[in-house]
């Protein structure tokens, strides 16, 4: 039996002389001649028939006969499984190396930004602690310098200047004290002598004094030998030690330190 379909599944036209009489076909196909086969262009097959999924019927297209496909006219399409269909639909183009480099650069930039922000926070915390300790040190220094505890708060520069002047004044005071001590130990300076009646009580009558002198032990000479001036100085020094320097002649340290 001769097949009436071509390779594309489109019905093949018969000869004009076999299909219909000349007079009936001449009106339908005026250009057809006797003995000539008239072929139509193949019917376009939609792209969906070649996709991974099942073929979808197209409106207006003739349906394919399964017997003709078995006969060898068209190869039968192998039904695809769901996994293959999913793999086909999920197949994507792999990312380019430029995109990979950009993504790595973005990730590295984010990590660097987070690490730099943490470093800045730690540096700011250290700076705040340093400033706090410096302020506490200046506050303690103001309590030791003259006029540091006044109502007027001294600035840092004024506090340092007052501390330097106070240290220099203390050094001068120590130098003067050392010089006076060295002069006294070398005998260059002697304390002023004063009459004995200033420090001692009035003595008894001359008779009682001579009686007391003669009543001493016989091995001593009594009062015939005059007393040495050194012993008199030592007794005077021991009895009048608190009145050697009057209070008016003492150095006024409070007025001297008040200028600083």
From Swiss-Prot:
SMART domains: HLH. One of its GO terms (molecular function) is bHLH transcription factor binding. GO terms for cellular component: cytoplasm; nucleus; RNA polymerase II transcription regulator complex. Pfam families: HLH (PF00010). Its main location: nucleus. Expressed in Schwann cells in the peripheral nerve (at protein level). Also expressed by endothelial cells (at protein level). May be expressed in neuronal precursor cells. Induction: Transiently repressed after nerve injury. InterPro entries: bHLH_dom (IPR011598), HLH_DNA-bd_sf (IPR036638), MASH1/Ascl1a-like (IPR015660). PROSITE patterns: BHLH (PS50888). Keywords: Cytoplasm, Developmental protein, Differentiation, DNA-binding, Neurogenesis, Nucleus. CDD domains: bHLH_TS_ASCL2_Mash2 (cd19743). Residues 118-170 form the bHLH domain. Residues 110-121, 200-218 have a biased composition (Low complexity). One of its GO terms (biological process) is stem cell population maintenance. It is found in: Nucleus; Cytoplasm. Gene3D superfamilies: Helix-loop-helix DNA-binding domain (4.10.280.10). Residues 85-126, 191-239 are annotated as: Disordered. Efficient DNA binding requires dimerization with another bHLH protein. Forms heterodimers with bHLH transcription factor TCF3. May not heterodimerise with bHLH protein HAND1. Transcription factor. Binds to E-box motifs 5'-CANNTG-3' in the regulatory elements of target genes, probably as a heterodimer with another basic helix-loop-helix (bHLH) protein such as the transcription factor TCF3. May bind both open and closed chromatin, acting as a pioneer transcription factor to allow other factors to bind and activate lineage-specific genes. Required during post-implantation development for the generation of some differentiated trophoblast cell types. This is Achaete-scute homolog 2. The gene is Ascl2.
